[in-house]
Amino acid sequence: MVSTYRVAVLGARGVGKSAIVRQFLYNEFSEVCVPTTARRLYLPAVVMNGHVHDLQILDFPPISAFPVNTLQEWADTCCRGLRSVHAYILVYDICCFDSFEYVKTIRQQILETRVIGTSETPIIIVGNKRDLQRGRVIPRWNVSHLVRKTWKCGYVECSAKYNWHILLLFSELLKSVGCARCKHVHAALRFQGALRRNRCAIM
């Protein structure tokens, strides 16, 4: 049986979220930054542990605020489909403090607008541009501790430029989404467990 998962990728301008997606799908990277101005949909099929998953990856342009309801979601063409995904990937640039603040704000808004009684939607925080480690503005341990211990989210650092931890990111994403119904196991713990197992490949 093929599972279908919708995933939203969000982040401030220039953090490299589209580069992450394209590196994952096409194994390519461009030094030229082309801002995302409209929602882009990618439909890859991924095999993990012998199971096929159809992904609907929604790459969104930077949004000023997360839509508080369905009416607001569909009133803005850039936000359509944002509230009905199975997981969120929130990307920031490890060399840009403002991009982390953006992720912090969007995450909080996602939690505040979540419909009461609905199941937990996994949120994974991604620190991109790991290849620019010397320009890091927040120590990795500080961010990791905040995200995993306080926010209870998964955390991965990657480099879209060098394809470092890109496949790992999406492998753990699939695992987290698949375990989202395990209500008695914390999301962050599920994610960390996934880091030690499972492999995926694009068809």
Swiss-Prot record:
<protein>
    <recommendedName>
        <fullName>Ras-like protein family member 10B</fullName>
        <ecNumber>3.6.5.2</ecNumber>
    </recommendedName>
</protein>
<feature type="binding site">
    <location>
        <begin position="59"/>
        <end position="62"/>
    </location>
    <ligand>
        <name>GTP</name>
    </ligand>
</feature>
<feature type="propeptide" description="Removed in mature form">
    <location>
        <begin position="201"/>
        <end position="203"/>
    </location>
</feature>
<comment type="similarity">
    <text>Belongs to the small GTPase superfamily. Ras family.</text>
</comment>
<keyword id="KW-0488">Methylation</keyword>
<dbReference type="GO" id="GO:0005525">
    <property type="term" value="F:GTP binding"/>
</dbReference>
<feature type="region of interest" description="Small GTPase-like">
    <location>
        <begin position="1"/>
        <end position="203"/>
    </location>
</feature>
<dbReference type="GO" id="GO:0090277">
    <property type="term" value="P:positive regulation of peptide hormone secretion"/>
</dbReference>
<dbReference type="InterPro" id="IPR027417">
    <property type="entry name" value="P-loop_NTPase"/>
</dbReference>
<feature type="short sequence motif" description="Effector region">
    <location>
        <begin position="33"/>
        <end position="42"/>
    </location>
</feature>
<comment type="function">
    <text>May facilitate the release of atrial natriuretic peptide by cardiomyocytes and hence play a role in the regulation of arterial pressure.</text>
</comment>
<keyword id="KW-0472">Membrane</keyword>
<feature type="lipid moiety-binding region" description="S-geranylgeranyl cysteine">
    <location>
        <position position="200"/>
    </location>
</feature>
<dbReference type="GO" id="GO:0003925">
    <property type="term" value="F:G protein activity"/>
</dbReference>
<keyword id="KW-0378">Hydrolase</keyword>
<keyword id="KW-0449">Lipoprotein</keyword>
<dbReference type="GO" id="GO:0003050">
    <property type="term" value="P:regulation of systemic arterial blood pressure by atrial natriuretic peptide"/>
</dbReference>
<comment type="subunit">
    <text>Interacts with CADPS.</text>
</comment>
<keyword id="KW-0547">Nucleotide-binding</keyword>
<feature type="binding site">
    <location>
        <begin position="128"/>
        <end position="131"/>
    </location>
    <ligand>
        <name>GTP</name>
    </ligand>
</feature>
<dbReference type="GO" id="GO:0005886">
    <property type="term" value="C:plasma membrane"/>
</dbReference>
<dbReference type="InterPro" id="IPR052661">
    <property type="entry name" value="Ras-like_GTPase_Reg"/>
</dbReference>
<dbReference type="InterPro" id="IPR001806">
    <property type="entry name" value="Small_GTPase"/>
</dbReference>
<feature type="modified residue" description="Cysteine methyl ester">
    <location>
        <position position="200"/>
    </location>
</feature>
<keyword id="KW-0636">Prenylation</keyword>
<dbReference type="Pfam" id="PF00071">
    <property type="entry name" value="Ras"/>
</dbReference>
<keyword id="KW-0342">GTP-binding</keyword>
<keyword id="KW-1003">Cell membrane</keyword>
<feature type="binding site">
    <location>
        <begin position="11"/>
        <end position="18"/>
    </location>
    <ligand>
        <name>GTP</name>
    </ligand>
</feature>
